[in-house]
Amino acid sequence: KEIPGKIVYEDDLCLAFLDLSQTTNGHTLVVPKTHYQNILDVDKEVLSHLIKVTKKLTNQIITNLDAKGANVLTNANEVAGQTVMHFHIHIIPRYNETDQIKIDFTDRSQEVDLDNIFNKINSL
């Protein structure tokens, strides 16, 4: 399948290319060549390889673009913001605290029962 954009990395299992949206300069997607809907479906060997490639590219992007850090993330299912139903990992370089990207982890610790959540997770 033709990828509209600039491919920055490719091997037998995956490719990485600049996201057309460029949330920040250097926003890159790492994508397996085999179709998986999201992280829940990815073969563990493929996922391990994708993480290694993501780490390499994140270091390369931070160094070569003078970024101060990066967000590395994926979305699983529509409720989590997945709009493309093919697994991919976002590498979003961060340059400063005012680059208009906000990932907010609200503290709800007073509202939840951690023991109950823990028990539900571990009952799987």
Where in the sequence are the language-model features?
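HIT superfamily nucleotide-processing domains
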Residues: 2-124
